[in-house]
Amino acid sequence: MALPKILYVDDEEINLELLELTFMNDFQVITAESAEEGLRQLALNPDIHVVISDLKMPVMNGLDFIKEVKKNNPEKVCMLLTGFMESEIMLEGFNKELIFRYLMKPWDRDELLETVQEALIR
């Protein structure tokens, strides 16, 4: 059986590589270095199950990226994974039902694995 696909968007290459290496046996991880690339990857891979995005990125931030994802893919389960606690963004994400979780970097492997597994059964 094929591994579930997750998309991880982050403007820092080291974070992309780390998440990909961490979960290479659990998920098929598709990475993108920008929100624009993330939207392209979603168009190319409609079977992506979970979308994880950094918050602070140039051009389009993570929440705006997730808003774009949800416009065309309301069924996608989205999460923010960030080094910044921004309560207003977190509240907007939850109140508008844009995000499933708001997680902090550095991530804990077991916590992130469990969260993605929860997202897959939604």
Residue ranges and their predicted role:
Residues 46-52:
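Active-site beta3 strand of CheY-like receiver
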Residues 43-46, 69-75, 96-97:
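Conserved phosphotransfer cores of two-component systems
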Residues 107-116, 120:
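C-terminal output helix
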Residues 64, 85-102:
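Alpha4 helix (beta4-alpha4-beta5 surface) of REC/receiver domains from two-component response regulators
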Residues 57:
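Receiver (REC) domain active-site loop signature in two-component systems and cognate sites
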Residues 13-31:
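Two-component/phosphorelay signaling modules centered on CheY-like receiver
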Residues 11, 31-40, 62:
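Helix N-cap/capping motif at the beta->alpha junctions
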Residues 10, 54, 82:
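Active-site residues of response regulator receiver
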